[in-house]
Amino acid sequence: MSVVKSIELVLPKDAVYLAGCIIEGQVVLTLNSTLVDPIVKVELVGRGYVEWNEETGASRDYSREVICNNKADYVHKTKTFPVEDNWLSAGSHTFDFHFNLPPRLPSTFTSKIGNIFYFVQASCMGREHILAKKKIYLMVQGTSSIFHSEKSLQNPLFVEAEKKVSYNCCSQGTICLQIQMEKNTFTPGERDIFTTEINNQTSKCIKTVIFALYAHVHYEGFTPNAERRSRVDSSELLRQEANTHITAFNTTKIVSTFHLPPVLSVSGSGSQDSEIMNTQYELVSTVHLPWTLTSVKAKVPIIITSNPVDSNQTAAGCRTRAPLPVSPDQQN
């Protein structure tokens, strides 16, 4: 029978930690029998990595795939708990701990190409080897180092896209698509409310309008020969489909709301994760025209920002609640 019955980490459930916050928790170690010379410790670790395959040499009549990758270490802190008289009796023992997150950290992130992850790990070691350990992954929201002026935060936005279309062999018309927003700068978890106006100057009916929020991630990596490479990958974060009935030569307005995820990478190269990746966001409204085999799209750049933690905030005050992340170990 093992000396250690269990080791557990006690942390606030479903918490999202802002960069610069304090992480408070407990390690609960339960022993079946007395343990001599134990080492009980807890670690806070934050890392990021990107990796993808890239074809090279196509212009030289040969091609081969090379692996491009990059990595970053964001935080690694360790606390070893003092043990009185260097032994622990059978039963449960509780150890309190806290860690200060650095003020500049990227947000938790996962994709097929890259991951940014954070975890707290508790362990108990005997004289020669690890007897037990426990790991919990954290959700961390990064903060912005580049702040946008009050004017850019408040100015309403208006975007218009117009397309002339041909249909039924010799018929022609125009579709005009407009998006209006009170602002285009948001924080994670906020509501994005926007109005779309569709002016249908054709003799056909428009039945479907699709709204989507995209993240365009620019990854930075290196080949085995230390040559810098980059790659851009886009993903759809949110999507809504409006089943409309916009009749011929008519105009319709649609008011939509997106509830942004509670954790998002902040926009642009001013973020801490910019050494391996940076993210841009875009809201796209699309009117599909199946009778012309084409579509009309209007695009609005979206800025995601997050203010640094106030020095007066308590540990509980700089946390929110969100679904737990999937660990990188579970994704592979």
From Swiss-Prot:
High-level lineage: Eukaryota, Metazoa, Chordata, Craniata, Vertebrata
| SUPFAM superfamilies named in the record | E set domains (SSF81296)
From the UniProt entry, list the residue stretches annotated as the region Disordered: 311-332
Subcellular localization, as worded in the UniProt entry: Membrane
Protein name, UniProt field: Arrestin domain-containing protein 5
Q: Does the keyword ATP-binding apply?
A: no
User: Quick one: a GO biological-process term for this protein?
Assistant: spermatogenesis
Q: Which keywords appear in this protein's UniProt record, sorted alphabetically?
A: Differentiation, Membrane, Spermatogenesis
The function of this protein is: Plays an essential role in spermatogenesis. May be involved in the anchoring of the sperm head to the tail during spermatogenesis by affecting SEC22A-mediated SUN5 and NDC1 transport and localization.
Top-rank taxon of the source lineage equals Eukaryota
The reply on keyword Membrane is yes
Q: Name one GO cellular component term.
A: cytoplasm
Q: Which family does it belong to?
A: Belongs to the arrestin family.
